[in-house]
Amino acid sequence: GAVRAGALTLLAAMVPFLMASEGWDDHSRARRRTGVDMAKNYLNSLAPNAVLFTNGDNDTFPLWYAQEVEGIRTDVRVCNLSLLNTDWYIDQMRRRAYESAPLPILMDEEKYRQGTRDVVLIDRNSDPMDLLTAMNFTLDDDNLQQFPGQKGYFHLPGNTFTVPVDSASVVASGLVSAKEAKLLKDQIQWTLTNGNGNTQSYVTKNHYAALNMIANNQWERPIYFAVTTGPESYLGLQDHFRLEGLAYRLVPFKSPKNDNPNILGAIGTEIMYENVMDKWVWGNMDDVEHGIYMDENNRRMVTNVRLQMANLSEALLKERDPERAMEVLDELMRAMPKENVPYSRVMMPVA
């Protein structure tokens, strides 16, 4: 009995060592800085004083860490659209944070407190309407719609909106390049759609607050959507996007039609090339000699980065700039080698 008990004790004592040896690479954070370095890449790709809309945990918390702990780009306001459904988070966004000025969500607290304007209906009217006028209509308590047996709802008077554009101002600010200036009109116009491209019949509080921000911003502060947020968060604005790295910037013109299915809107090749080649860091992914373990989340993240770099290279080729297109691909292969990050189908356009 004593021998058996001793053997069982020895076997049980070995279990933690076995678990450690088999799972050490999964859990060790030694030399693994991909999370925070990718957060830096997001932030350092943005224009000064930018607003960045994110949606999930993995595209928000690393950015908050980079700002709160490492002090990276505290002029940028990371705005999580999931949390923007709550009144307390809208309160936060309306206050200054570090070097970031309050976001231009211009409505009194009682207009967005929980239970008020949680859902805003949209009239089936496709006549273009100034977005700020539509916002003011919805904020007027006299425009509450009552339904028999139900509580009242506020509503937007249509689904197609415009935002005015001061051409001289957006060119002078650097938002629009000289070659893009010919695309400018006196306003942008778009229809509010959902993730499937269908016209929406309502918006929830988070998207209503985002629209309020866009209406009041008037192109003064750079607004971006992280590429990972997904089409359900884009408010139908995809035709007015410009890719500048790992985020789409809202621009005051309709982008030329792009035949690349992986791209929404246009690519700002000059800005994105500078971001990729001069600002991005790689969290030791490029260290082939020592190697680095990449878990599932990191591999997913790398797939997205590879895709955006491939898109940039293709756009440079279309601009008849093969030298820089090849430089981007060379950097892609160097920074994310197959020894550390196995290839996936996203590498097919690169082949």
Model segments located where?
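ER/secretory pathway lumenal C-terminal domains and tails of membrane proteins involved
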Residues: 1-51, 61-349
